[in-house]
Amino acid sequence: MYLYTLILLFLASANVNAYANPGACSGNCWTHDPGLYQRKSDGKYFRFATGGGIHIASADSLEGPWTDDGYVLPSGSIIDLDGKTNLWAPDLHYHDGTYYLYYAVSSLGSQNSATGVATSKTMEAGSWTDHGTTGIESTPSSPYNTIDANWIAVGGTQYVNFGSYWNNLFQVEMENGLKVKSGATPHQIAYNASGIHRQEAAFMFERNNYFYLTFSGGIALGYNDTWPAPGEEYFIAVCRSTSATGGFVDKNGVSCLNSGGSLLLSSHDFVYGPGGQGILQDSSKGFVLYYHYADTRIGKAVEDYQFGWNQLKWENDWPSV
């Protein structure tokens, strides 16, 4: 909890020039909790976002121009829970010739949640098949909330990271891209002990024999009603480990299970509350951090959020923006 307080104090006093501004974006630049993937066949970019049946946008470059292509699941999910027509937090991966998209079915403040999955050969609108629940589900008696799924494969083993608030971030082994492994039990990989445990949006990736766990912390929404106190808005942090299944620590060696986390990106210049992040291994730009943010020159409502991206820089195997 003490370390998490230090992060908030640093956010409130950070040099506004410490970060590079987001890369250029033209066309449809709205997004929320983006998922981003580059098609294997031709390098075209597809960007997915929270809302409706998961928004789809596409472009031939990260800079755009981005076009609005419709929805992954125009009629919503076949999972019968509140929120089935307003899906959240898309996560993309490619495996054995198929694109997989994980999505969350839930409602604000509820643990009645499930992680669903849809598949496609192209990522184009109209090409997606909904397979319903992965078996990653939660109820009010669960220690976690099964939203914000993120897939990673290590050798021949697949895992999904998930979680938001409650006891924060968990991981579970998958049988395949569609279903959780029979008998698998989720285990905790990160926890923020302070306040109401504002931690979510796990995204894990591998580089140079390290596994990096990025996540979002702080207040994610409601900026159109009240600005949070300086430093309490959304931000992105990172820990790393030599194992994908645990042992994550920050730059100071503090465990991510004990409120650890090194700041990766926070508010600066016109960028406010960056979060809902992921990492794209771009064919030409290398590791790219992508996220949504409120542009203070445009507006602070969710409807005004913008697509942000930055190429990561590296020092001593730690990323920076």
Swiss-Prot record:
Catalytic residue positions: D33, E200
EC number assigned by the record: 3.2.1.99
Gene Ontology biological-process entries: arabinan catabolic process; xylan catabolic process
Subcellular location field: Secreted
GO terms of molecular function: arabinan endo-1,5-alpha-L-arabinosidase activity
Secreted keyword on record: yes
InterPro entries: GH43_arabinanases, Glyco_hydro_43, Glyco_hydro_43_endo_a_Ara-ase, Glyco_hydro_beta-prop_sf
Keyword Transmembrane among record annotations: no
Gene3D superfamilies tied to this protein: Glycosyl hydrolase domain, family 43
Principal place of residence: secreted
One GO location term (cellular component): extracellular region
Reaction(s) this enzyme catalyzes, per UniProt: Endohydrolysis of (1->5)-alpha-arabinofuranosidic linkages in (1->5)-arabinans
Signal peptide positions (record): 1-18
Keywords: Carbohydrate metabolism, Glycoprotein, Glycosidase, Hydrolase, Polysaccharide degradation, Secreted, Signal, Xylan degradation
Glycosylation sites: N192, N224
Involved pathway(s): Glycan metabolism; L-arabinan degradation
Annotated site location: Important for catalytic activity, responsible for pKa modulation of the active site Glu and correct orientation of both the proton donor and substrate: D148
UniProt function note: Endo-1,5-alpha-L-arabinanase involved in degradation of pectin. Its preferred substrate is linear 1,5-alpha-L-arabinan.
Similarity section: Belongs to the glycosyl hydrolase 43 family.
Protein name (database record): Probable arabinan endo-1,5-alpha-L-arabinosidase C
UniProt source species: Aspergillus fumigatus (strain ATCC MYA-4609 / CBS 101355 / FGSC A1100 / Af293)
Gene name of the encoded protein: abnC
